[in-house]
Amino acid sequence: MFRGGTHRLRGQPGLSLPHGPRCYGSAPPELQEKTLVLVKPDAVQRRLVGNVIQRFERRGFKLVAMKLLQADQGLLDKHYQQLRQKPFYPALLAYMTSGPLVAMVWEGYNVVRSTRAMVGDTDSAVAAAGTIRGDFSMHVSRNVVHASDSVETAQREIGFWFQRNELVAWESGDRDYTWGP
């Protein structure tokens, strides 16, 4: 178990991860958070969904909800409410409705901040190698994934994309090995 400081992803210079235990998904319930991750239409078309899922599973996070859907304008207007007045919003809306996307809820210790580190900078030109965007994104307007930026935002966004009964509470078998009985 890792405690304190930041550490590097294997083979990924410069990518620091937050403080805390190394096996993030297996923390006791009182230490768990949830976050929303959207695999955007460009990544679905390029068949990158499995690559994204694999990165979260390798970090020990637990998938508690997932669905493939064609997002409509109403849902995206709620999700991107803070961007609706921006000049690029019509292009963002066209992009996000251009094909199916995958919405997922991941659970684990410090999952929001860890996910932001894993996803990388919004601008693919500056996203670090080893991050999802650094490895797969080709342009700032086609940046592969969305990830909630705070615990509060995650709670709100999860409510837009999922009904409460769509989140599956299940016990991860690796908790005892990581945290003890």
Swiss-Prot record:
One of its GO terms (biological process) is CTP biosynthetic process. Residues 1-10 have a biased composition (Basic residues). It catalyses: a 2'-deoxyribonucleoside 5'-diphosphate + ATP = a 2'-deoxyribonucleoside 5'-triphosphate + ADP; a ribonucleoside 5'-diphosphate + ATP = a ribonucleoside 5'-triphosphate + ADP. Its main location: mitochondrion. GO terms for molecular function: ATP binding; lipid binding; metal ion binding; nucleoside diphosphate kinase activity. Feedback inhibition by ADP. It is found in: Mitochondrion intermembrane space; Mitochondrion matrix. InterPro entries: NDK-like_dom (IPR034907), NDK-like_dom_sf (IPR036850), Nucleoside_diP_kinase (IPR001564), Nucleoside_diP_kinase_AS (IPR023005). Transmembrane segments: none annotated. HAMAP family: NDP_kinase. Major role in the synthesis of nucleoside triphosphates other than ATP. The ATP gamma phosphate is transferred to the NDP beta phosphate via a ping-pong mechanism, using a phosphorylated active-site intermediate. Through the catalyzed exchange of gamma-phosphate between di- and triphosphonucleosides participates in regulation of intracellular nucleotide homeostasis. Binds to anionic phospholipids, predominantly to cardiolipin; the binding inhibits its phosphotransfer activity. Acts as a mitochondria-specific NDK coupled to respiration. NCBIfam families: PRK00668.1 (NF001908). PANTHER family: NUCLEOSIDE DIPHOSPHATE KINASE. This is Nucleoside diphosphate kinase, mitochondrial. It comes from Columba livia.
